[in-house]
Amino acid sequence: MSEHQDQNIGLTPGDRFGRFVRRADMRETLAWAVFYTAVFVVLALFFYPKWMPAIHSTNMKAIERLMVIFTIISAPVCGFVLSIATYTFRHGTRGNTPPQDSAPMRTNRLGIAVFSAVAGVLCLIAVIYGITAMNSEALAAERNSKNALVVEVTGQQWAWSFNYPQLGVQSADLNLPVDRPVKFIVKSVDVNHSFWPVQLGVKADANDVVAVEINTTPNKIGHLDVKCAELCGLYHAYMETNGEVMAQTDFEKWVTDNGGHNA
């Protein structure tokens, strides 16, 4: 029986766990874990909102909130994994002389149980929050669908076109009134595309078989970047156009100026 095994005889799982975390290597590893976790939390709370595109809809706000919360939830697990990698990098073998073997260490069941429980709870929170957010957006879209402005979106290599059947207007640019629900009906006339008005926080595949519907409510006046998010050929990177969320009076004027009628 080794000296290390003899020292563990008669110790409770809690005692072994306490001795385990007081080891020099574990103290350093845990210190790095706390550091990395704090870095990810700071990034989520203070930098992600600045790095995200401008928010012009309830959907985009929900996406920003989801990114922040998911980053915070995953920060402890990611931080612990990175701390192990950091310790290994700092104390790994250098040169041609291998280090001496450390004292043997039996599996610490309490440590494994704590890590598994924490990771499991964090994953459960992420799943519940994600499902709740998804359902709330679906319910909001259903409530607003009756009064929604319908916009038929057509993708083709390599341009977008927009038809407003309720208003009798067609356009190469996407113009929307603020604070009015919008239903996009998306399709393609050739290869697959992906309709992505960035600041609205929605995205839909465009194909030539079935039309795809997505809903949102623009809630802030401003510029929109409309892009294709699926590789669709040689000029895919240039398949983009402009958009604008405008005041209701400005939108009505745009409709009449382009030969349409206001519903």
Question: Where are each of the predicted segments found?
Answer:
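Non-transmembrane, membrane-proximal soluble domains of secreted or membrane proteins
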Residues: 3-23, 44-67, 89-263
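Alpha-helical transmembrane segments
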Residues: 63-80
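Membrane-helix interfacial anchor on the cytosolic side
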Residues: 82-90
